[in-house]
């Protein structure tokens, strides 16, 4: 029973005492009225009598929207308790993130090229399990702190993809369009080859190609495969086991796909590395709908950001599952089709209108045109799979207002937050809809590396590789669902599970 009190007091420990007449919530001039008491929401806190919740200014629009859409016809105490619980979850996560971010990386290797202005860093956040892994990227302006944050991100991803190793990253501050790039990479990999031989595994990343640059250059310095350090440091194999594992890595990543279930028909040959990350993003959506909603993707409306390998492969796999692609926004332009593109149309876009990593088709909208309207298109699922830190708070809110229910992060850190992991825009998304985090949704390639290192059967099939990636993503989402079965705060829960594992077990033993 709820009693009427003359004092407008909302006590979270005794929710039966509150005023039911004439309340209002005040957010810096924006008022939502529901009765006689109020909740003050200034730039620092929400007060509800005996307690308070810290609030940052950028969260206020989301709080107002949340009330208007979900709580305007419900008792005031429910809204307060929701805010309280949500902010307490965020506070708990931020405490874990603070501990994780403040832990200094175990190894930082700094390199200065004697022939150019290039500088580079290998950051190994930890040698958890005897080794660490993370790709090599190159861009102008890259710095040590960026590489540290990426190494920490990789360590979180390995809690899902495996193996149970530390996170690492290589970064080179140099213009990838400079004709001296090849020489810079050759001198870089010569300098870091002792790490790659013993306990560090790398691969391609931004502006560094795995097949055409990383593999041939590292081979010239006696590295059997860019992941050799993980094989040696984590698995501690015999000579015969090492040869077999590295052989599987060589063959598996560059394997030409033959099964039509995992690649489109046509003259172009696609490799595992071309398709598996986008496939994993699609599987994360499919498994999420199955586990959390007991629904299929039939008829679901999808918006995709980007048209590189990840975005285009994800779109095609989602269409294969029965979804409709209603919008594509790429850096040069895009398409909007309210009726939705089906499988054959998406295949055509994938095969015939993907030039490099961009969409090119006659009659497509300019970037300004598509950017002005795509965020208001009705959709069930959004796949940000272009560059990092692109999605703004305004774009997110427009998607939500148009009915968006789910986001699967094909890109690493897709939101335009300055924070490494869980900034205010990501937090807003996580509270308003179902947000599948990047370290689950886009873990496909990392999982393939782990699978190839541990797989015992020499006959590697397309189905074996891709079904393992699918199963890994399913298990990660099931673990999240077991702790939090609601449709919101999915990323918060996933982060807490990963960070609790890393902070509790910073040093795992090698795998024998």
Pin down the residues of each PLM region.
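Glycine/serine-rich phosphate-binding loop and adjoining beta1-alpha1 elements at the start
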Residues: 159-297
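Glycine-rich phosphate/diphosphate-binding loop of Rossmann-like nucleotide-binding domains
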Residues: 261-375
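Low-acidity, Ser/Thr- and Arg-rich intrinsically disordered low-complexity segments
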Residues: 3-6, 11-21
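N-terminal cap/recognition module
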Residues: 124-156
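Adenosine-phosphate binding glycine-rich loop
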Residues: 400-512
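Short, Gly/Pro- and small/polar-rich lid/capping loops
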Residues: 67-110
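Long, intrinsically disordered low-complexity tandem-repeat segments
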Residues: 25-27, 31-53
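Rossmann-like adenosine-cofactor binding region
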Residues: 333-435
């Amino acid at each position: 029973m709820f009693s009427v009190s003359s004092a407008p007091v909302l006590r979270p420990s005794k929710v039966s005492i509150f005023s039911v007449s004439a309340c209002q919530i005040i957010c810096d001039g924006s008022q939502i009225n529901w009765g006689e008491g109020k909740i003050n929401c200034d730039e620092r806190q929400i007060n509800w009598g005996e307690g308070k919740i810290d609030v940052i200014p950028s969260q206020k629009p989301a709080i107002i929207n949340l009330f208007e859409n979900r709580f305007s016809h419900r008792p005031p105490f429910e809204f307060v308790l929701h805010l309280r619980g949500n902010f307490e979850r965020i506070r708990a996560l931020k405490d874990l993130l603070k501990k994780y971010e403040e832990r200094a990386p175990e190894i930082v290797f700094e390199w200065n090229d004697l022939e150019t202005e290039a500088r580079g860093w290998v950051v190994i956040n930890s040698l958890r399990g005897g080794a660490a892994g993370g790709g090599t990227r190159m861009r102008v302006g890259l710095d040590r702190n960026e590489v540290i944050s990426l190494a920490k991100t990789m360590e979180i991803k390995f809690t899902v993809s495996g193996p149970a190793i530390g996170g690492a990253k290589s970064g080179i501050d140099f213009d990838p369009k400079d004709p001296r790039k090849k020489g810079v990479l050759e001198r870089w990999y010569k300098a870091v080859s002792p790490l790659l031989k013993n306990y560090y595994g790398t691969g391609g990343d931004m502006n560094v190609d795995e097949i055409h640059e990383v593999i041939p250059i590292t081979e010239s310095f006696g590295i059997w495969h860019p992941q050799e350090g993980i094989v040696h440091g984590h698995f501690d194999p015999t000579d015969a086991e090492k040869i077999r594992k590295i052989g599987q890595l060589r063959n598996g990543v560059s394997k030409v796909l033959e099964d039509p279930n995992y690649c489109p028909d046509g003259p172009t040959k696609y490799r595992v590395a071309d398709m598996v990350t986008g496939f994993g993003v699609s599987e994360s959506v499919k498994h999420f709908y199955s586990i959390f909603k007991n629904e299929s993707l039939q008829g679901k409306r999808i918006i995709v950001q980007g048209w590189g390998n990840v975005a285009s492969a994800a779109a095609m796999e989602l269409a294969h599952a029965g979804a409709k692609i209603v919008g594509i926004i790429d850096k040069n332009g895009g398409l909007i089709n309210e009726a939705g593109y089906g499988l054959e149309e998406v295949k055509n876009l994938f095969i015939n209108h993907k030039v490099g990593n961009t969409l090119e088709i006659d009659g497509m909208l300019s970037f300004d045109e598509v950017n002005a309207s795509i965020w208001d298109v009705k959709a069930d699922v959004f796949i940000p799979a272009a560059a990092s830190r692109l999605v703004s708070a305004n774009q997110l809110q427009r998607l939500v207002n148009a009915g968006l229910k789910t986001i699967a992060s094909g890109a690493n850190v897709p939101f335009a937050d300055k924070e490494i992991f869980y900034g205010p825009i990501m937090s807003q998304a996580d509270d308003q809809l179902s947000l599948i985090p990047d370290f689950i949704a886009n873990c496909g390639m990392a999982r393939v590396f782990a699978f190839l290192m541990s797989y015992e059967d020499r006959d590697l099939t397309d189905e074996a590789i891709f079904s393992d990636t699918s199963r890994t993503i399913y298990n990660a989402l099931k673990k999240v669902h077991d702790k939090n079965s609601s449709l919101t705060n999915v990323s918060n829960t996933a982060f807490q599970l990963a960070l609790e594992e890393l902070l509790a077990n910073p040093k795992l033993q090698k795998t024998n």
